[in-house]
């Protein structure tokens, strides 16, 4: 009886001990797991976290954050680790120089831009897009038989005005007759200055 009673007492004590500490043992763990579920998304926000991770050691990686999103975190820490290596800054500098060189070549392809005008990358891309659209329009009109040579130069001028209205309204303005504009703008050639002037002064 005493042994059974002792066993029952021990079992009761163990059960009480388990119930007493269960909220303490599992409560924070569950809460930590919930935080980890949101943590990988926070890590992948470059505006907030990338500068901090960039200053930390490579060991500050997925092991700190739990298993949630470990693959994405490893990829992120791997990129940061390569940047901190010996070849990282040089590779990044070469990539930047390559991009700048490509933009410089693209600027040279855009006509009627003053030599002293400095174009940002976004303005260069916008001008290039407008110029490509303009060239495609010229090619489309050149494919129509019976157009006189002088009318092509006028198309470029009138097309510049239509480009402005196209961005503000709808593309159908290209179908409007251009004979009226030919008399006013006859003799002017080249890509219309209105197009790049509009982009230079947004």
Swiss-Prot record:
A molecular function (GO) term: bHLH transcription factor binding
Gene3D superfamilies in the record: Helix-loop-helix DNA-binding domain (4.10.280.10)
Gene Ontology, cellular component aspect: cytoplasm; nucleolus; nucleoplasm; RNA polymerase II transcription regulator complex
Compositional bias ranges of the Basic and acidic residues kind: 149-162
Coiled-coil segments on the chain, per record: none
SMART domains according to UniProt: HLH
InterPro entries membership: bHLH_dom, E-box_TF_Regulators, HLH_DNA-bd_sf
Region feature Disordered, mapped onto this chain: 143-187
Keywords: Developmental protein, DNA-binding, Nucleus, Transcription, Transcription regulation
One example of a Gene Ontology biological process annotation: embryonic heart tube formation
Subunit structure: Efficient DNA binding requires dimerization with another bHLH protein.
Stated name of the protein: Heart- and neural crest derivatives-expressed protein 1
């Amino acid at each position: 009886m005493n042994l059974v009673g002792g066993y029952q007492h021990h079992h009761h004590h163990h059960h009480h001990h388990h119930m007493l500490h269960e909220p303490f043992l599992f409560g924070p763990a569950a809460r930590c797991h919930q935080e980890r579920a949101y943590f990988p998304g926070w890590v992948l926000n470059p505006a907030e976290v990338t500068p901090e991770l960039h200053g930390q050691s490579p060991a500050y990686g997925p092991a700190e954050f739990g298993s949630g999103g470990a693959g994405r975190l490893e990829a992120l820490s791997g990129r940061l680790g390569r940047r901190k290596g010996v070849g990282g800054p040089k590779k990044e500098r070469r990539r930047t120089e390559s991009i700048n060189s490509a933009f410089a070549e693209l600027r040279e392809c855009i006509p009627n831009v003053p030599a002293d005008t400095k174009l940002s990358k976004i303005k260069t891309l916008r001008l290039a897009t407008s110029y490509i659209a303009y060239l495609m329009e010229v090619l489309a009109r050149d494919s129509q038989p019976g157009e006189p040579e002088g009318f092509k130069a006028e198309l470029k001028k009138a097309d510049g005005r239509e480009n402005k209205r196209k961005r503000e309204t709808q593309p159908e303005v290209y179908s409007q007759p251009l004979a009226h504009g030919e008399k006013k703008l006859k003799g002017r050639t080249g890509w219309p200055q209105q197009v790049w002037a509009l982009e230079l002064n947004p």
